[in-house]
């Protein structure tokens, strides 16, 4: 089957921004003008094509990155609409990994918001070329040039207006195209009747000034253009387009456009700019990967190269499991067998589809540069590489942040236990930042995610999609106990009941073990003081006592026990008697070994604008945190600290409020450390029921 569009005429783009900048409305208008939908869907009416989950339509926010294919000016445009809420960062992250270009949408009133900075950093991480659409120019307080300055100052971007608005707020009547040096005037509400006109006389001077700046900036990056510009003081429309495209692809130039998606103004010009300035798959660097030999290799965007693709999203739906893939090289055919090189597993491709949000079109094959979805994959999860069995390669994977909040979950009825388990498995397959584990001590199921809204929506999905009602508990900290000194312990169990008695007797030495050893047992019995068959039961008795600790009922770790002596009775001794004696000796010894309470310490890294550095450090210190490092780079501060997990609950919300939503943090387990005496006393007292 031949290609519908040559690779040079394919654009894989994302639409990304902060909440309420108008991303989804912009996507809806793009679909309307490019003919995918025939009626405009509004986010606030709950009718947007890309917001296809029930929760998205209710809340008016985009949660999952919906992938849609459309066409414009004889180009195929694959679009991903991404969420702006920080709890759904993984959706933006995985979009950036597979895109070639991004339209960053900003509100003309709100300008650069905290989430804009996060999204911009994610685009930087994957070196994604981008352009800007300053939306909502019809709103009171809209200021195009102010937003352009914020993008330059706060995002350190080489932002360059290629348009100017004619009028603003309720009086936005048209747009000046600085590249073509003319105006577009809107004659109807649908934005379909557009008149080309000369630049209005009252704006000629301002437009000439901005066009000169545009020519100057574009010429700076191109030797050929700078010569022409220095000689003639002018660049033609074609020369400007070529220069802007080169600047976007290579030099970090960011063209800035304006309009109002809601009022249907400026969207077709955004589509023109996508075609003119954003890269095709052949314009970006070939994807890198690692061969089985360990050698690095690249795969060019070419149908004739060996097949390789990256799974960037897994979704359950009524028809089965959909795995979204970005094709990097070669051709993937329906019914073929491929290799999951990340997991070293063979997979069969049952069906292939291209998505138009919640509608789908079945296709026989996907080619290099395509975004599509596969049905039938059993073992593939987010970040896995698919390739030919004859030409294995593992592509660079996604950066997946660690979850930062966890809570216990249980079904409201016993009968829902199995349904809950299935729901959690399906949801964790879809979302790599959603983790499920079982607490061995409480036997509770614990779910972890990127924030409270993240977990709230997942619990909501359990109810809607899997019909499971669940209770959510407060998160618990898993403390531990250990000993700080050495001692001896003795346990003698002697009972006489009727005929046969019970007798077991052991003497042990206890000392702290190396960190990470858990429970270590050494047998030093000589001369048969304790027969061999009773040594195992005595050790088991000690190990079981270890599990419930001596201070507050938490497991005892890193303890070394040496069995040195004991005695037995030919008739009355038994395995049970020695198990009880072992437990008694352990309890006797541990009390004399200075037992202490340990708590999990977390490695925490906080990123925020440097204005908030003092507040961030002060807050971490108030949480018993130890700051281990800090740096400031380009107005962004990073703080590394070690903080007790018990003090980190509610931190995501506190950080947001403290940094006006502009701070992000990651957290992972570091080690166990001793709990300060005053804190330990409160925990012990509470667990012993004295509080």
Swiss-Prot record:
**Location of this chain's protein in the cell:** Cytoplasm
Entry superkingdom: Bacteria
Supply the SMART domains for this chain: EFG_C, EFG_IV
Q: Which GO terms describe its biological process?
A: ribosome disassembly
The answer to whether UniProt assigns keyword GTP-binding to this entry is yes
Q: Which UniProt keywords apply?
A: Cytoplasm, Elongation factor, GTP-binding, Nucleotide-binding, Protein biosynthesis
A GO CC term assigned to this protein in UniProt:
cytoplasm
Q: Point out the signal peptide segment.
A: none
Residue ranges of every copy of the tr-type G domain listed in the record: 8-282
Q: Which GO molecular function annotation, any one, does this entry have?
A: translation elongation factor activity
Transmembrane region positions?
A: none
Query: Where does this protein hold GTP?
Result: 17-24, 81-85, 135-138
Pfam families, per database record: EFG_C, EFG_III, EFG_IV, GTP_EFTU, GTP_EFTU_D2
The UniProt family comment states: Belongs to the TRAFAC class translation factor GTPase superfamily. Classic translation factor GTPase family. EF-G/EF-2 subfamily.
The record describes the protein's role as: Catalyzes the GTP-dependent ribosomal translocation step during translation elongation. During this step, the ribosome changes from the pre-translocational (PRE) to the post-translocational (POST) state as the newly formed A-site-bound peptidyl-tRNA and P-site-bound deacylated tRNA move to the P and E sites, respectively. Catalyzes the coordinated movement of the two tRNA molecules, the mRNA and conformational changes in the ribosome.
Per its record, how is this protein called by name?
Elongation factor G
**Native organism:** Prochlorococcus marinus (strain MIT 9215)
